[in-house]
């Protein structure tokens, strides 16, 4: 989320949720690869803090009324001077799913406090495929901790682990 503008995210996610008839699962993350961080100039900022701000600003866009006047530490969003309601200019689309599509957040580091915070917000973690398995093993307890902190049912089924797979027409093709 930190590498995109909240207004663009709000429009794109609302459109995708509508096109998918409310079946969208929205994947978010702070942009954790060192190459991403450098490429987008995010080396000196708190990416987790910016990710939360962007998410909250998207919510304000979706569930607020135009003209928007949303101020944050990292982004300011306004349509007060260009709002033209008769043609829909300056009014963001809203997703089909209320209050927002289900959210999954990337989990990368061992004993990630971000997983706990995500679970407290009702988001589900998805452990990255390219991290060491003993790091991935630390993610479920942190997820359950967040659910406990939020007085939610400690159901581990919200936790996901990403894996690369190849699907082929037959076993021979798949193993070559």
Segments the model singles out, each with a brief description of its role:
Residues 1-176:
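Active-site-adjacent structural elements that line small-molecule/cofactor binding pockets in enzymes
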